[in-house]
Amino acid sequence: MPSSNSGNELLLRFFESAHFTSQLCVAYLSRYPNNIGIHHFLCEKLATFPYEEIEFFIPQLIHLVLNKDSESVALEEFIISQCEQNTQCALITFWYLQAHMVDLGLQPHSSCFKICKRLYNRIQILVFMSSSSLIQSQQKISENVTPALILSGIMLGGVCVPELLKKAGPIAIAQGRKAPRQDPDESDVDVLRRLSTEPRYSLDVLRSSLNNSIVEQHSEVSLRLKAPELTRTHSYQSSATLSIDEQRRVLRSNYFQQEIQFLFALQDISIRLIIVPRQARLSSLRAELALLNNNLPADVNIPLLRSYHKEVSHKIVRIDPKEATILNSAERVPYLIMVEVLSGELSFEPQSKKNKAKVQKIVSHKNQRKRWFDLTDVDPYTNLQDSTDNDISESESEGGDLSMSPLIKGLVPDTLSLSKSFSSFGNVSLQVPSSHRDTDVVLLSGRHSDSDGNGALKRSKIYASEITARMRAAATMLSQLDAEGSRRPKAETERIKNSIILDMQRLEEERLNEPSIYPVSVDISCAEDLRFGKETQKAERKGDRDDPSAATFQEDWYAKKERIRKSSPYGHYPNWDLVSVIVKTGADLRQETFACQLIYAFQRVWLECKEKVWVRRMKILVTGDNSGLIETITNAISVHSIKKNLTKQLREAELAQGKIAGKNVVTLKDYFIKQFGDPNSSRYRQAQTNFLQSLVAYSIISYLLQLKDRHNGNVLIDSEGHIIHIDFGFLLTNTPGNVGFESAPFKLTADYLEILDDRFDEYRSLMKAAFKSVRKNADQIILLVEVMQNNSTMPCFRAGENTSAQLLQRFQLQLGDKECDDFVDLLIQKANCSVWTRLYDLFQNITNGIY
């Protein structure tokens, strides 16, 4: 930056002040896209902030680098640099770029697409290639005249002014790496045209590219970039020939390949379940997860839960199929899984004994052609040895899911023909072969040799594969029945469908009664507790067949965690832990992630201002343009489920007493009294305080962000009384059906007022204080919106640049303190028992059965 320019001097002084935050740094990157010097300085400044802050802004940084037409390559190089340093950053960036590749498939000639394509391929090379020479070959200076002339001038000037070479030299070199402007050749255009005419399959093309070759010179996705031909792994004679950095790169590459295929496998399960009737989805899901467990333990984790401060993470050892739950959804099939992990078990430090052996195994090409988590091939007799090679520690040469019992054999005949089997399928019954039970008993007793245990483990995996294959066959037949329903009598179709579904459900009852295969190291003294846990779980499953997620969310998280630990073959490890995530496909979660960013920004403001309000931060991992992982909010249940369950219990009690069941729906206060005791007790008062403080926060957030679709299925109450809002598909400028039906500023129902009771004035007072706090820090919210609103594909930015202008208006910055208090009172008055809120809840109850 020229020091003679007074404006730049003031700007530099501001950049170097203590008040210049990471958020301001991102905002100024957006404001100065065409000033190469400022851009490079800001990227250097951004690199000085903690990684946690940098990761928070990854969506904004990617949006800027793709949509801000700039000659500077500083931001692109900054992103690559961060990905080199941190695996979490590389993974998140990879997924976001993949989603943008799909978005931009219809604009193959745009600069956005070219930048995205270049970055996407560079990230692939970075994370999948184990050879440093391949990565370094991507860092050569291109034939750019202007940077070359500037660099020559800097070198000449550096003779007299050495500082000039030190400061400006790296900028010129970085700019020299900028790819020259050129149009893709005709063959590239043909490839792009195929991508653009089939947008639904573009993500599948990306997946195929990753699975087959990761990055190839002639793949459709890479569009024949001028890059060296890449193979799946680089050939080495021995790990001894590798430097420490190269060994670390081998471990990172191995992690990325397994992690991405693991997440693909989870998403594919959800997609396959779409064709399965709702009554049979739970059984099918658990069979799929049983097969997935054959590849665990593995070098995979849940990126949402990684530590920011070190390249050490948890390692997934098991996903308990019995605990998996289908969430209520008519169109898509999101599901919840309980993931068992060992904390601090996954690292990329090559000098540990375990990682040394792993590096040697990788570079020796033993797993060169191996595909992890490939659930499309369910031949139970293949790749058994590979599935038992994943280790947890040096003392355990074989891992895998040791707790999955053999379930059934003979769900459908092996040679069953779909076109001929419907008439006879209704007579098929599920049986658990006695030989399977005998195997479990031997393993449970611990009286067997290692060879016996290995054989039993392999047989268990064979049976799990058989079950999955037959479950899929049954699901296919069910979908075929729906397709052929008009060509056969309706009664016959229903009979066959019911028979198949009942048999699949009977499988669950059989499984709950089966003992598990435990490793010898497990303490069998807890068997009584395990049987009790199975009985409890069995009762829950029977009681919630119509709503399989109900029991999952009603059970206390810590009790569930302890129950699963006792029944787990890995529960005896001191670093064992349990995490819960939701796998969701068929929905773009980038807007949800952005909403969570904004809500977290509110939370930080209130924490800094020490306001006594409460917000629950949510984490979401975007894994594509229509998929992702969502952190589960534990110990919380929706208001809909609360009212539905209490109403059902009340009516059953009335019928048991010989009374005519009434039609009145219970209130939230009934639940609070049931959950927290007498309204005058200290426990109830604390829950009331928690409700009040969280209601204030979400009332202000709902108004400022214009959160819509606030029915009772999207509002939770946790075990401490806090209210929590979820599902942010409608905010800022988009509304359900593009109709402004929810015109109240926020949701403040009679239920809420009944819980507040005599503390309504306290609610009003805290609303005013919390609103004033966010007004003073409005720029922290508005800047996030301003950065993202241009050229965004998210529905919430339908108004374009007017989005941030409308948000600014809602902050009412022109008002004084007294006028601001009056404004908040007016908002509360409009929201208080709003007729629009009542009508929307009634509409949801009539159309979707939401209480």
UniProtKB/Swiss-Prot annotation:
In-chain residues carrying the UniProt-annotated modification Phosphotyrosine: 236
Spans annotated as Catalytic loop: 706-714
Composition-biased stretches (Acidic residues): 388-399
Membership in a protein family: Belongs to the PI3/PI4-kinase family.
Record region (G-loop): 564-570
GO terms classed as biological process: phosphatidylinositol phosphate biosynthetic process; phosphatidylinositol-mediated signaling
Quaternary assembly: Interacts with cdc4 and cam2.
Protein name: Phosphatidylinositol 4-kinase pik1
Chain positions with Phosphoserine modification: 202, 219, 222, 235
Keywords: Golgi apparatus, Kinase, Nucleus, Phosphoprotein, Transferase
Region (Activation loop): 725-749
Known function: Acts on phosphatidylinositol (PI) in the first committed step in the production of the second messenger inositol 1,4,5,-trisphosphate. PIK1 is part of a nuclear phosphoinositide cycle and could control cytokinesis through the actin cytoskeleton.
All copies of domain PI3K/PI4K catalytic, residue ranges: 558-836
Domain PIK helical: 1-123
Top-level division of the source organism's lineage: Eukaryota
Catalytic activity of the protein: a 1,2-diacyl-sn-glycero-3-phospho-(1D-myo-inositol) + ATP = a 1,2-diacyl-sn-glycero-3-phospho-(1D-myo-inositol 4-phosphate) + ADP + H(+)
Location of the region described as Disordered in the Swiss-Prot/TrEMBL record: 384-404
Cross-referenced PANTHER family: PHOSPHATIDYLINOSITOL 4-KINASE BETA, PHOSPHATIDYLINOSITOL KINASE
Cross-referenced SMART domains: PI3Kc
Localization: Golgi apparatus; Nucleus
Organismal lineage: Eukaryota, Fungi, Dikarya, Ascomycota, Taphrinomycotina
GO cellular component: cytoplasm; Golgi apparatus; membrane; nucleus; trans-Golgi network membrane
